[in-house]
Design a protein with these regions (language model features):
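Sec-dependent N-terminal signal peptides
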Residues: 6-11
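C-terminal motif of bacterial Sec signal peptides marking the signal peptidase cleavage site
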Residues: 14-17
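Positively charged n-region of N-terminal signal peptides that target proteins for export
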Residues: 1-5
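A short, solvent-exposed, low-complexity linear motif enriched for acidic/polar residues
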Residues: 19-229
Length: 229
């Protein structure tokens, strides 16, 4: 039986419309501590030690689906929901998600004053080290107290990592289809695994505290995990 051209066109339009509407994925970045969601400013615990993270800023770079980079760099402010949700184009299924933790070496040479204020690398984000002429990768500030209570005689915490040698990457082999929702989870307890909250609470990636920055950076790949919903 013959089908007329007029009867075929509506079907073709329907399938075309459905396909175009799904040529993307959404990416959500979540914070957890030992697998439990938390918010910046909430008191957390490692054993008897109380921890309060008061600022969590970081960069992710070269976010790729399969072999194609979809975002060259994003700035994440854990107190700004908009900076933790992204839409990435994807027209066909891929089997890998990859990204860098920090700013890649090419972007790390950029001048922050050359960008508009809404750009991830803008000086407005206060992530640039003028003394080192490069970006901080992770900027995490807070307080710890071995007594188990934040508020009196707290010890300051400042984990500021940067420099090209501290850039880390991660690849996850996972099936991703257009229309999927991706959740990238950052477990901050994994970040400080093996790091002393008594003696290793300060690093600006300088010579005298560089070993702490290396520890934190080496923990980053294990601290991030991806799931597809």
């Amino acid at each position: 039986m013959r089908l007329s051209l007029l009867s075929i066109l509506p079907l073709a339009f329907l399938f075309s419309s459905c396909g175009n509407g799904s040529e993307q994925v959404t990416l959500e970045i979540n914070l957890v501590h030992n697998g439990i969601p938390f918010e910046v400013g909430e008191t957390l615990y490692k054993g008897d030690t109380a921890i309060k993270f008061e600022l969590i800023h970081f960069y992710l770079s070269e976010i790729a689906l399969g072999a194609e980079v979809k975002e060259s760099v994003v700035f994440v402010n854990a107190q700004d929901s908009a900076s933790m949700h992204y839409t990435l184009p994807l027209s066909k299924k891929v089997d890998q998600f990859s990204f860098g933790m920090g700013v890649d070496s090419l972007n790390n040479m950029q001048d922050p004053t050359s960008f508009d204020s809404n750009h991830p690398l803008s000086s407005a984000n206060a992530m640039y080290w003028s003394w080192a002429t490069m970006y901080r990768f992770f900027k995490i500030d807070g307080r710890v107290n071995a007594t188990g209570s934040i508020g009196v005689d707290d010890q300051l915490l400042a984990w500021h990592t940067g420099k090209n040698a501290l850039y880390r990457t991660k690849e996850t082999n996972i099936n991703i289809k257009p229309g999927a929702h991706l959740v990238l989870t950052f477990d901050i307890a994994e970040l400080y695994s093996g790091v002393s909250l008594a003696t290793e609470t300060m690093t600006h990636s300088m010579v005298d505290d560089y070993a702490i920055a290396v520890k934190l950076s080496d923990n980053l790949p294990a601290a991030f995990s991806l799931s597809v919903q």
